[in-house]
């Protein structure tokens, strides 16, 4: 028995091999188990590692990474493919994500849809095409955009530029010309997107469009957020305008973005990641209808656009640039209709083409218009350039003015509300001699 005890204490234990695959640990042999036990090699090494050979490697210090590091871009998402949001879903622990169904967990649009709907691209050079940009307008817009991309010491630059003025004065088109001149592709919004059947949706859309513009700036290209007719979507036009919660949230969102332009978060996501500053340009007709704290000087810089005579002549030269109209005739045309908007002259030019369209309809027949325009193998019709004389332009201009006066003078809505029958609705046409019947 003593022999058996002594043999049990002689069990051989192979030391662990830290080198891995060159040698392997063997099954311990024992006299007690018998001398016929075969030794086999195991593919697994002992996981117990000696503390004397343990090597600890520190993590990489990101502060020591320089801008010259060729692999630096791997740590940042530089793709503009919105489907990256969907592909990355589930890669991050839920602790660091916002609640489901909010934020950017789900792709809002594909990249092509962003380009086709939100992103406005320009493929023309306004200097070559002869478009006129008013110097005062260009100065105000260029200075505002440039200031917002600069870091000025001890100075708070207003984020929003509000351009307002009369209807049809070319505010939006002048902005687009300046954007094209500066090679900026702005993210566009309109007043129709500032209201929704869902409460809070327009405010969320403003933040999404702002962050989309910030992503473009982060990738090294200038961008801006351009909102058309802000007062029509967020203002109060008389006592009959219904003031909804979306109007309130749109005003509050723009105020919050103007106060914190580099920390614009989506609803439900509150990480402290800064975004580039994006200048916001808005247009409108009457900013007195907006919420007063939004248009205060620290948040919005206001610019009243009233084109001078020289501006109107310059814009009209651009409108009639392909019609071979002499500059003297354009000056006479502008001076003949001094109270009209710039858009009036564009409508006047379109009215001249009515004669050519009327000739084409007479040639093909009224019953064949659909076949020729919608389902035709011949392609769209082409017209010769109509000759525009000053006499014809003045004639059509007076016709447009007369139509404007009729709208202001003959207010049939008041007659319909005050009388059950048609009443004197045709009296104006009878008095002017244009009523036949």
From Swiss-Prot:
Domain of life assignment: Eukaryota
Entries under InterPro entries matching the protein: ATPase_AAA_core, P-loop_NTPase, RCA-like, RuBisCO_activase_AAA_helical
Pfam families on file: AAA, RuBisCO_activase_AAA_helical
Any GO MF annotation of the entry: ATP binding
A GO term from the CC aspect: chloroplast stroma
Record keywords: ATP-binding, Chloroplast, Nucleotide-binding, Plastid, Transit peptide
Residue segments, region Disordered: 1-26
Keyword Chloroplast set for record: yes
Predominant localisation class: plastid
Binding locations of ATP: 165-172
Summary of the function given for this chain in its UniProt record: Activation of RuBisCO (ribulose-1,5-bisphosphate carboxylase/oxygenase; EC 4.1.1.39) involves the ATP-dependent carboxylation of the epsilon-amino group of lysine leading to a carbamate structure.
Name of this chain's protein: Ribulose bisphosphate carboxylase/oxygenase activase, chloroplastic
Source organism (scientific name): Malus domestica
Source lineage: Eukaryota, Viridiplantae, Streptophyta, Embryophyta, Tracheophyta
């Amino acid at each position: 028995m003593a022999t058996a005890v002594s043999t049990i204490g002689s069990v051989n234990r192979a030391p662990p091999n830290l080198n891995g695959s060159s040698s392997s640990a063997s099954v311990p042999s024992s006299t007690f188990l018998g001398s016929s036990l075969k030794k086999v090699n195991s593919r697994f090494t002992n996981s117990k590692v000696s503390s004397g050979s343990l090597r600890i490697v520190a993590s990489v210090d990101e502060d020591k990474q320089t801008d010259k590091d060729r692999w630096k871009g791997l740590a940042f998402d530089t793709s503009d493919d919105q489907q990256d949001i969907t592909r990355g879903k589930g890669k991050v622990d839920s602790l660091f994500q916002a609640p489901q169904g909010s934020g950017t967990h789900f792709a809002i649009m594909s990249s092509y849809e962003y380009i086709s709907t939100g992103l406005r691209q320009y493929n023309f050079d306004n200097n070559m095409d002869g478009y006129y940009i008013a110097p005062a307008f260009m100065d105000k817009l260029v200075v505002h955009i440039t200031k917002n991309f600069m870091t000025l010491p001890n100075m708070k630059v207003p984020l929003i530029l509000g351009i307002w003025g009369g209807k049809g004065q070319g505010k939006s088109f002048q902005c687009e010309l300046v954007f094209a001149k500066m090679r900026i592709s702005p993210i566009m919004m309109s007043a129709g997107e500032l209201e929704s059947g869902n409460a809070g949706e327009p405010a969320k859309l403003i933040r999404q469009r702002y962050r989309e513009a910030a992503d473009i700036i982060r990738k090294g290209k200038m961008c801006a957020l351009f909102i058309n007719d802000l007062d029509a979507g967020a203002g109060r036009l008389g006592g009959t305008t219904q003031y909804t919660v979306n109007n309130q949230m749109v005003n509050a969102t723009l105020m919050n973005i103007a106060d914190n332009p580099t920390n614009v978060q989506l609803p439900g996501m509150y990480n402290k990641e800064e975004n580039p500053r994006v200048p916001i340009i808005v247009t409108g007709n009457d900013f007195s209808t907006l919420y007063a704290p939004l248009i205060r000087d620290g948040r919005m810089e206001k610019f009243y656009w009233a084109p001078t005579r020289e501006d109107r002549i310059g814009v009209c030269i651009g409108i009639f640039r392909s019609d071979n109209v002499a500059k003297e005739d354009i000056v006479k045309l502008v001076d003949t209709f001094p109270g009209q908007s710039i858009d009036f002259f564009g409508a006047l030019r379109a009215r001249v083409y009515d004669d050519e369209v009327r000739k084409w309809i007479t040639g093909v027949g009224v019953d064949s218009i659909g076949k020729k325009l919608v389902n035709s193998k011949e392609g769209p019709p082409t017209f010769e350039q109509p000759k525009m004389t000053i006499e014809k332009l003045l004639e059509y201009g007076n016709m447009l003015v007369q139509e404007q006066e009729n709208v202001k003078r003959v207010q049939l809505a008041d007659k319909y509300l005050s009388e059950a029958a048609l009443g004197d609705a045709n009296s104006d046409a009878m008095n002017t001699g244009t009523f036949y019947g």
